[in-house]
């Protein structure tokens, strides 16, 4: 497999970056728009166009929904219109790829159709947890063949709904996937979580917020219990925020180089973990300045390790681990609350430990996280495991460690198209970099 020579710099990085739309918001908006088609057409502005979101678009099109990107305004396909009807053709098949949102959000939608819909995905996706969602749907009266990919949902035109108990300790997406479709169920839906702490809980809060924006009545007043009242989901316009988790690798460049990086379009109020990101960057010794529509981070000349619980923001763990490995030599970082990362695109805890140690770092796995001791590292191959966040973590390490070769950098297209070009532009000192905008050689059909 080909490798990408990660650019290095011995000088502070100074750049302004615009990251594309939030994957989490884009795919939730697409699902809600598809469920709202009986009420009319919806529009989405600022949508992310990446492998994950294109898989969601294809999945909904496979269910008969019309998703169009007129691209008459130079938006590069980020302005979408959703219309049509939930009416899949006989024998419909959905490719989930490696997208957890497609795997967990679309089966409840398919259950509302009158056809049997088969789901499959990448080989690695077959190892991702899905049983709690399928068991929950069965408890609600949905007929499903199979207990993991590939599986088939036998739609009967409606879902009874009611109360269902699930263990969502493996993924908050089990809860979100059910809630998104719950208002379309005959009796509505009550989801009760019965297991250990739910990881990435802010993503459930995002789901609840967007449901309310679509006119759905949601009661989340009791811990580990969510009630969605039956009723129409409104067709409306959705404005997608920039993806703040995708901004973190660029902000990390400021942290580890002592430079200054500004991200434009940073929301003042957000359902994404904006406050947590600011707290993390501050704990790493950086100065954080937030304006009306931007965030600017100025890194310190050096910084120490941190002790942090990342349960709610596990997607940031690879970037945080990379920054921890590059802290002041001898300083120790403890990343806690992320045992669930063993069930993501890859076992991220094992992968991070293996790759940091391969390049001379010191990283040990614990029951629920990592202990990283910063030490001098050397170049070598950084394996990405077909995981977009592992690939960007390798780029962060390579910024300070010459000779790092990142395997399969193309996997970053899962959520951040054109990452290699954007990274190079940032290091070249260019400003107003537009993530997701056309570059020479970009595959426009992605």
Swiss-Prot record:
GO terms for molecular function: 3-phosphoshikimate 1-carboxyvinyltransferase activity. InterPro entries: Enolpyruvate_Tfrase_dom (IPR001986), Enolpyruvate_Tfrase_sf (IPR036968), EPSP_synthase (IPR006264), EPSP_synthase_CS (IPR023193), RNA3'P_cycl/enolpyr_Trfase_a/b (IPR013792). It is found in: Cytoplasm. Disulfide bonds: none annotated. The keyword Phosphoprotein does not apply. Its EC number is 2.5.1.19. This is 3-phosphoshikimate 1-carboxyvinyltransferase. It comes from Mycolicibacterium vanbaalenii (strain DSM 7251 / JCM 13017 / BCRC 16820 / KCTC 9966 / NRRL B-24157 / PYR-1) (Mycobacterium vanbaalenii). The lineage of its organism: Bacteria, Bacillati, Actinomycetota, Actinomycetes, Mycobacteriales. The gene is aroA.
């Amino acid at each position: 497999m080909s490798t990408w020579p990660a650019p290095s710099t011995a000088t502070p990085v100074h750049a302004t970056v615009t990251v594309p739309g939030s994957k989490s918001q884009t795919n939730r908006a697409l699902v809600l728009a598809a469920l709202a088609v009986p009420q009319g057409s919806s529009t989405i502005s600022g949508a992310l166009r990446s492998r994950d979101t294109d898989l969601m678009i294809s999945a909904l099109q496979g269910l008969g929904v019309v998703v169009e990107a007129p691209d008459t305004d130079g938006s590069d396909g980020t302005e979408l219109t959703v219309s049509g009807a939930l009416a899949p053709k006989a024998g419909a098949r959905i490719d989930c790829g490696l997208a957890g949102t497609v795997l967990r959000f679309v089966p409840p939608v398919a259950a509302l159709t009158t056809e049997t819909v088969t789901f499959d995905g990448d080989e690695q996706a077959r190892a991702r947890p899905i049983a709690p969602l399928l068991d929950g749907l069965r408890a609600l009266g949905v007929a499903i063949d199979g207990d993991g990919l590939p599986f088939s949902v036998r739609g009967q035109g409606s879902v009874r709904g009611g109360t269902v108990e699930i263990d969502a300790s493996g993924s908050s997406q089990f809860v979100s996937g059910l809630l998104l479709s719950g208002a379309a169920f005959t009796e509505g839906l009550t989801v009760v979580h019965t297991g250990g702490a739910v990881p990435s809980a802010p993503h459930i809060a995002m789901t609840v917020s967007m449901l309310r924006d679509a006119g759905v009545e949601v009661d989340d007043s009791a811990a580990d219990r969510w009630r969605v009242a039956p009723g129409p989901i409104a067709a409306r316009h959705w404005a997608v925020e920039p993806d703040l988790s995708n901004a973190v690798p660029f902000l990390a460049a400021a942290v580890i180089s002592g430079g200054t990086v500004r991200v434009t379009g940073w929301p003042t109020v957000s359902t994404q973990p904006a406050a947590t990101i600011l707290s993390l960057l501050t704990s790493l010794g950086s100065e954080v300045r937030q304006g009306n529509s931007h965030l600017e981070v100025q890194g310190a000349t050096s910084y120490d390790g941190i002790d942090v619980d990342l349960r709610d923001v596990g997607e940031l763990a690879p970037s945080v681990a990379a920054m921890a490995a590059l802290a002041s030599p001898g300083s120790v970082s403890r990343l806690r609350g992320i045992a669930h990362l063993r069930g993501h695109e890859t076992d991220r805890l094992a992968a991070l430990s293996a790759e940091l140690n391969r390049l001379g770092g010191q990283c040990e796995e614990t029951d629920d996280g990592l202990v990283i001791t910063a030490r001098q590292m050397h170049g070598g191959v950084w394996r990405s495991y077909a995981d977009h966040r592992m690939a960007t973590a390798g780029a962060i390490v390579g910024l300070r460690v010459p000779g790092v070769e990142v395997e399969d950098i193309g996997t970053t297209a899962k959520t951040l198209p054109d990452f290699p070009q954007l990274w190079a532009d940032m290091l070249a000192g260019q400003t107003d970099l537009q993530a997701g905008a056309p570059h020479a050689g970009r595959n426009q059909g992605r």
